[in-house]
Amino acid sequence: MQKEDLGRLLEYTVWANHRILRPVATLTVAEFKKDMGSSHGGLRGTLAHMVDSDLLWLERWKGMSPRDLIDEGEFPDVVALRDRWTLVEKHRDAWFKGLRPSEVSEPVQYKSRDGKSHEAPLYQLIEHVVNHSTYHRGQITTLLRKIGAKTVATDMVIWDREAKIKAKRREG
């Protein structure tokens, strides 16, 4: 996989992650924090897990060791969560821009949270992060439907269409 393809995937996942936050931002704080029996509790827990995972993988790619999980309590509301996520994305974007194209195929050695050593090419780990977010956006959509909230589509084809429209507007 080429660096530009991975960059495109990362751009898409940022768009989709922020898009899924739109309906969440319309909820009450109680709805945002409610434990709904999902794998990470509810909306806040699932979104906090996504932010934590994005940060964890970025740290691994930079050669850092595992750290403690982000506590979902750090996010009293959607705004705090979005702000933290945006900061993580900015750091990831700056790191990614600094990569040489050949580096995406190089192996990354990292440790899982249980201390086991692993190794995989960087491009596979970036693909994993994008896929991981897609999986949890599906869970968020289900949780939103469970409480009767509006949902949004986060399909890549929609992102592609919107990008083409924006490009045409810039052209003229």
Where are these regions (language model features)?
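Short, contiguous alpha-helical
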Residues: 7-71, 112-172
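Helix-adjacent hinge/juxtasegments
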Residues: 64-105
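Short acidic-hydrophobic surface loop/beta-edge motif
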Residues: 108-110
